[in-house]
């Protein structure tokens, strides 16, 4: 086994592989071209896309030539894989716009200027968009038997609930991508999530039927990322964790990784970082012997946040996290508060308005009544910008505002409210 496949195996990144011996031989003999596809089903990639992206990067670091394929055409159709119902089709204008955004995001992870093996971005609309219906049916469709397609999980799982011809044909279009890249770019390997196995093997079958005998192409799937507690990876109460900082702030992104379960953290270090085997094994031991220190989680959060958002964003995320943990909220800038308290309930007040702390506690619903608000203050349960306030007659002034824009109220340990001005 090549060093690359050994590393992927150590990291648990190989779910299934076609012709392991043949692929191993191919990787030993030459630096190959490989691809993974990303359909623009939203205006940003999310952390579920990180695994195939980083796997492409691992191949590039080993000297191979990655192709990131944006599905400008297949994104108009919709992949039935893993879906229980028909997707809502997006307009071409939206798919074009999203394709460009995804292309920009991919450029953060792959080196498009590497001297000997630069990554390449392709868009399957460039060839599928030119394909006439006659060409599609005669040259591509004739290679697929209905029984063969019905046997694939992506189709068979939808027979009961129903599947349109549009989504039924997705497998054929993705197969045509592989054939086109094989012919035009000499691309010999497709990588995808475990739910793509049926589509990948269909592409290999199309290459086998369409090309001369002895055509060499391979498929490799990576595992579905799971969580030990059974909840869906990449989702929080606030929704998906996106790679776009406007949709998921670097602070929220960092916090997602910091909160990784001890049972998952070593697996995620293998999946999502480029730490060596020795470093990962050292963190595994630390998690075993001193889990309360959460050293592995901190390193995981640092590595992935830098990878996706850069060093400066990591430093801001760490600063906000430390300030919130210690209660030193006054140390934060207005921008930090805006990021760190994005999902906290809030209302807006005029700076000239006289605000009684008791009234604000009731209006914000931190306290159910004025009587309870006074008790909360007297009992030391109320904090303004992290500092305890015990004066029941306190009026909020400019001194209670962070950069004259925000006041952060807290009752007890976890109930926050944000006043904006």
Swiss-Prot record:
Signal peptide: none annotated. It catalyses: tRNA(Tyr) + L-tyrosine + ATP = L-tyrosyl-tRNA(Tyr) + AMP + diphosphate + H(+). Residues 355-421 form the S4 RNA-binding domain. A motif ('HIGH' region) lies at residues 40-49. GO terms for cellular component: cytosol. A motif ('KMSKS' region) lies at residues 232-236. It is found in: Cytoplasm. SUPFAM superfamilies: Alpha-L RNA-binding motif, Nucleotidylyl transferase. Keywords: Aminoacyl-tRNA synthetase, ATP-binding, Cytoplasm, Ligase, Nucleotide-binding, Protein biosynthesis, RNA-binding. GO terms for biological process: tyrosyl-tRNA aminoacylation. L-tyrosine binds at residues 35, 170, 174. The keyword ATP-binding applies. ATP binds at residue 235. Its EC number is 6.1.1.1. GO terms for molecular function: ATP binding; RNA binding; tyrosine-tRNA ligase activity. Belongs to the class-I aminoacyl-tRNA synthetase family. TyrS type 1 subfamily. Homodimer. Catalyzes the attachment of tyrosine to tRNA(Tyr) in a two-step reaction: tyrosine is first activated by ATP to form Tyr-AMP and then transferred to the acceptor end of tRNA(Tyr). This is Tyrosine--tRNA ligase. It comes from Bacillus velezensis (strain DSM 23117 / BGSC 10A6 / LMG 26770 / FZB42).
């Amino acid at each position: 086994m090549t060093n690359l496949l050994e590393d992927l195996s150590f990291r648990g990144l190989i779910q299934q592989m076609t012709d392991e011996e043949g692929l191993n031989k191919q990787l030993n003999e030459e630096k190959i071209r490989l691809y993974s596809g990303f359909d623009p089903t939203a205006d940003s990639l999310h952390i579920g896309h990180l695994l195939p992206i980083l796997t492409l990067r691992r191949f590039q670091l080993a000297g191979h030539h990655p192709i990131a394929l944006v599905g400008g055409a297949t994104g108009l159709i919709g992949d039935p894989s893993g879906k229980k119902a028909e997707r809502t089709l997006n307009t071409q204008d939206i798919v074009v716009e999203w394709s460009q955004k995804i292309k920009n995001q991919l450029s953060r992870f792959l080196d498009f200027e590497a001297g000997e093996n630069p990554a390449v971005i392709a868009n399957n609309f460039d060839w599928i968009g030119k394909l006439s219906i006659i060409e599609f049916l005669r040259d591509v469709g004739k290679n697929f038997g209905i029984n063969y397609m019905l046997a694939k999980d992506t189709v068979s799982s939808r027979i009961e609930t129903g599947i349109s011809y549009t989504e039924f044909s997705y497998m054929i279009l993705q197969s045509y991508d592989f054939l086109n890249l094989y012919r035009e770019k000499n691309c010999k390997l497709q990588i995808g999530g475990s739910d793509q196995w049926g589509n990948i093997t269909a592409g290999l079958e199309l290459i086998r039927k369409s090309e001369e005998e002895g055509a060499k192409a391979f498929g490799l799937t990576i595992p579905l990322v799971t969580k030990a507690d059974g909840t869906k990876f990449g989702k929080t109460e606030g929704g998906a964790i996106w790679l776009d900082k406007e949709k998921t702030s670097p602070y929220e992104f960092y916090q997602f990784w910091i909160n990784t379960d001890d049972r998952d953290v070593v697996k995620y270090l293998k999946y999502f970082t480029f730490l060596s085997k020795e470093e990962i094994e050292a963190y595994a031991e630390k998690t075993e012997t001193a889990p309360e220190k959460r050293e592995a989680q901190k390193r995981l959060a640092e590595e992935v946040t830098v990878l996706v958002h850069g060093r400066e964003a990591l430093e801001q995320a760490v600063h906000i996290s430390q300030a919130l943990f210690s209660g030193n909220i006054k140390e934060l800038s207005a921008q930090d508060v805006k990021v760190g308290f994005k999902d906290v309930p809030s209302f807006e007040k005029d700076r000239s308005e006289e605000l009684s702390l008791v009234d604000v506690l009731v209006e914000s619903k931190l306290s159910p009544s004025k009587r309870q608000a006074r008790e909360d203050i007297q009992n030391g349960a109320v904090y303004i910008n992290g500092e305890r306030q015990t004066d029941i007659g306190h009026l909020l002034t400019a001194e209670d505002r962070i950069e004259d824009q925000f006041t952060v109220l807290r009752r007890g340990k976890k109930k926050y409210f944000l006043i904006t001005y």
